[in-house]
Amino acid sequence: MLSRALLCLALAWAARVGADALEEEDNVLVLKKSNFAEALAAHNYLLVEFYAPWCGHCKALAPEYAKAAAKLKAEGSEIRLAKVDATEESDLAQQYGVRGYPTIKFFKNGDTASPKEYTAGREADDIVNWLKKRTGPAATTLSDTAAAESLVDSSEVTVIGFFKDAGSDSAKQFLLAAEAVDDIPFGITSNSDVFSKYQLDKDGVVLFKKFDEGRNNFEGEITKEKLLDFIKHNQLPLVIEFTEQTAPKIFGGEIKTHILLFLPKSVSDYDGKLSNFKKAAEGFKGKILFIFIDSDHTDNQRILEFFGLKKEECPAVRLITLEEEMTKYKPESDELTAEKITQFCHHFLEGKIKPHLMSQELPEDWDKQPVKVLVGKNFEEVAFDEKKNVFVEFYAPWCGHCKQLAPIWDKLGETYKDHENIVIAKMDSTANEVEAVKVHSFPTLKFFPASADRTVIDYNGERTLDGFKKFLESGGQDGAGDNDDLDLEEALEPDMEEDDDQKAVKDEL
């Protein structure tokens, strides 16, 4: 009787284990509300991606995420990677404040109250390095040459501090710098064999990288600030290709002036043009980020639109400052020699280049419909007409919110088509720019009241016909306020278009 009872108990336990076992896909745990707490209890360090099956960014991340999971598992690490389909597990998504996809959070020791937001890049090395920084020392102690070689081989970029006295002030400054950098592995050594292997005979810091010149030796007084500046100048390739994976490094970096080479990989002298661009980059490390964009790639077409370029106009070079204004600049010459690109960059840094403002040609029928069509060339004349109250939608053709607004805006135009001093208008801000208005989100709605003082009023009320009418009838008061929707920096990210069924949830970085 006892053995039979034990058998039943064993079968019941096996059934329970089978039901609660954590499913895996490509070494990534698949979590649901029913097993989320179990996963947190089982793993002290858990990185969780909240994703949507339709999300382009999530699809692009998947292979790198799996690669990171496999690498950590192969190393015998305590850290595990997991994923949650937020469209199926809406309670979990709401609990952890998921507003866009992918949202990635790091849970340490089962703490659900304050998980850490993942902030690094989207390549496997970025993920692994960020996690190791969160779970171990800021810098790994390298006791022999094998440990040093292993660290250098482990990532695209590594930094090693060589200090004969690990307790010196310089070593302490190095460790402070290591704590401040999330996405690069650091090592520290006092071992004489490691010094010899890397040709150092005194204290120093070396940045190792698997591209360009291979290594950079720090020179000067070792302080946290100077080390961070040294790393900023040398951690990225001279020329970085814009992709789904590199976008966080490009936008998240400290260098906010970017020069972009739009170059189809199929062009006959591809290597030569890229070589010229790279040669020019050598003189602007830490000042201007040099970015290459494959103009033939489908995912990059929106970036071309943003710069007012067509595929047939490439190769081409443009420069942009990613400050609040997001100002664009165009070279004086179409020649893509290293000398011309270098000259263009120098002229920009010296303040000798005027911003490049795009404009479409003015359509012949621009004023024939209830909603007037504005382009760069007629904007000033129409918007700042002293006798007219002009309400303008600044839109992007691909923007989901703009598409939803379109029929309402058309009705508004119909409502006021015969009004003597109210004009309803629209402007495609991906193809037209004006000095008087800087558009930072889509759609942006601005009111230009009839006056001589060039007043501009932002609209941020309800996007309904009644809301717009109240705003206009109140002279631009009822509904006035700052506008904040789809940020233009997101417009530069690949695969950002929203599907109708996405409920306007942004596919965020």
From Swiss-Prot:
EC main group: isomerase
In-chain residues carrying the UniProt-annotated modification Phosphoserine: S333, S359, S429
Pfam families xref list: Thioredoxin, Thioredoxin_6
Cellular component terms per the entry's GO annotation: cytoskeleton; cytosol; endoplasmic reticulum; endoplasmic reticulum chaperone complex; endoplasmic reticulum lumen; endoplasmic reticulum-Golgi intermediate compartment; external side of plasma membrane; lamellipodium
GO biological process, one term: regulation of oxidative stress-induced intrinsic apoptotic signaling pathway
Enzyme Commission identifier(s): 5.3.4.1
Catalytic activity annotation: Catalyzes the rearrangement of -S-S- bonds in proteins
N6-succinyllysine, modified sites: K224, K273
Signal peptide: 1-19
Post-translational modification: Phosphorylation of Ser-359 by FAM20C is induced by endoplasmic reticulum stress and results in a functional switch from oxidoreductase to molecular chaperone. It also promotes interaction with ERN1.
Site note Lowers pKa of C-terminal Cys of second active site, residues: R463
Cited Gene3D superfamilies: Glutaredoxin (3.40.30.10)
Chain's role: This multifunctional protein catalyzes the formation, breakage and rearrangement of disulfide bonds. At the cell surface, seems to act as a reductase that cleaves disulfide bonds of proteins attached to the cell. May therefore cause structural modifications of exofacial proteins. Inside the cell, seems to form/rearrange disulfide bonds of nascent proteins. At high concentrations and following phosphorylation by FAM20C, functions as a chaperone that inhibits aggregation of misfolded proteins. At low concentrations, facilitates aggregation (anti-chaperone activity).
Cross-referenced NCBIfam families: ER_PDI_fam, pdi_dom
Protein name: Protein disulfide-isomerase
